[in-house]
Amino acid sequence: MNTFKPLGEALAARQASQHAINFIEGDNNERRQPFSGLFARAAGVLKHFQDCGAAPHDEMIIMVERNEQFIDAFWAGVLGNIVLVPVAPGSTDEHRAKFFRILAKLQRPCLCTDAATSARLNNYAAANGLAEDLKKLE
């Protein structure tokens, strides 16, 4: 049995395997992602994170709608030694308020989100006097 210290090593070691993650979205929509493709995608997402300024030990809020986006961002963070803070995007103002409470507690935050969630966060911030708080992410 292999033992891996960093979790990212486990994914890297399984690139040649036939194992995969199955994403099921709805009754007739299923997609299989082999570990080799997952590693390549995560490495690409990590490069994007790094190009945007994320560094090891930074805190990355992952707030995305789709499971596939979450898995890619999660493994990118693992590969980059980034502290992951998963937050459900949700559909209510309470979800957005929770995001801002979490953001206030972080020291070096980054945000991985989708366009729709970003728009909802920006609208909520503007309506609730929190626009300045979003500057912490710049």
Model-predicted segments: where are they?
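Short beta-strand elements of ligand-binding domains
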Residues: 64, 87-88, 134-138
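Conserved helix-loop-beta element of the AMP-binding
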Residues: 107, 127-138
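Short acidic/polar active-site loop segments enriched in Thr and Asp
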Residues: 55, 83, 109
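Conserved AMP-binding/adenylate-forming core of the ANL superfamily
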Residues: 21-75, 91-100
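Short hydrophobic alpha-helices that are characteristic scaffold elements of the AMP-binding
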Residues: 50, 74-86, 105
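A generic secondary-structure signal
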Residues: 10-13, 48-52, 101-106, 124-128
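A short N-terminal helical cap/helix-turn-helix that marks the beginning
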Residues: 1-22, 40-42
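Conserved ATP-dependent adenylate/AMP-binding module captured primarily in the ANL superfamily
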Residues: 89-125
